[in-house]
Amino acid sequence: LDFIPRLLAAVPPASALLRIYEDRYRRSHGCDLNYRNLWWTPPLGPKEALALERGQIEALGLQPLVSITDHDNIEAPLLLRVLNESRDAPLSVEWTVPWRDTYFHLGIHNLPGRQAGARMSALARFTEEPREAELCGLLDWLGEDRETLVVFNHPYWNEKGTGQALQNALAEEFLSIYRTWIHALELNGLRSWRENRRVMDLAARAGLPAVSGGDRHGCEPNALINLTRSRSFSEFVAEIRFAGRSAVLVMPQYRESMSSRVLGAIVDVVRDHDGHMHGWTKWSDRVFYRCSADGEAVPLSRIFEPGREPSLIRLFVAAARLMELRGVKAAIRHVLQPAQELSL
């Protein structure tokens, strides 16, 4: 959650309150609060997320092929493969690739089952200790399996906050160097149409297809989906990787105000959800903090009793839940930017 101080910097009262908590933490622990050791997980477990995505596609009268990814681990697809209804779930991951002054995310879809563990170990080592000279060999190894798909996810998203111009330049340089091992670029359902349009232009210049992707962290199904005649995910990989064909369908929710949709995702995060696959029904069950680099990741529900969280957290949760009210939702839609106009 290292975006929190950057986000609150634009809100002076909240920023001042945050500094008070940071000073208190520093006095108590003798070190600064490391926001990289604080993170949240989506409100839906793998089973629920898969059902959500499948349901949207089936409502169109289509047969769903869904690849569920998480950052830097394949626990979700491994769990799905235990269930009868999702035994064919592809083993996929969103891999964090530190590169020069930024980091990128590559979607690695449909890893070979027998080699998935070895590949994930190698990816984790690179993320922990990146060596640029090793990246070509690692990507080449991933691509040895012809049923694996490598997607450059949201290349223009300035997640690290290094500056948009630098992010754009590094993304284009990264693609020019590793183009041989990248099979497609992602159009992301939670990024603006302006940004996705730039990604389409970049893909066209590189001679690569653009495919749909998500970053669905709430309860809204993906706003962009691929249409295909493939009957299996391996066939879909071949269609993208070797035939270079991709048809992306824009769902109605993508036309809504992006700010409104992001706020909706935040509301989903701080809402309690019964029936979570891991039993994480409270929002505080799904927010974790690691006190040290080698320490245990502990949910906030174990650190604070319900209702005894720091006032800044309680105020944030209360404000987010206020946005669930129908009148507040309507007001937000009126105040925020209008729906996106889509044009090629």
Please report, for each region that a protein language model flagged, where it lies by residue.
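A metal-dependent hydrolase metal-coordination microenvironment
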Residues: 1-140, 144, 189, 193-203
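Charged catalytic cores and adjacent phosphate/nucleic-acid-binding surfaces used
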Residues: 1-23, 78, 83-87, 99-116, ...
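Hydrophobic faces of well-ordered beta-strands that scaffold small-molecule active sites
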Residues: 66-67, 89-93, 150-152, 185, ...
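Short, well-ordered beta-to-alpha junction loops that form the rim of enzyme active sites
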Residues: 70-71, 153-156, 216
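Internal, conserved structured core segments that host functional sites
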Residues: 135-171
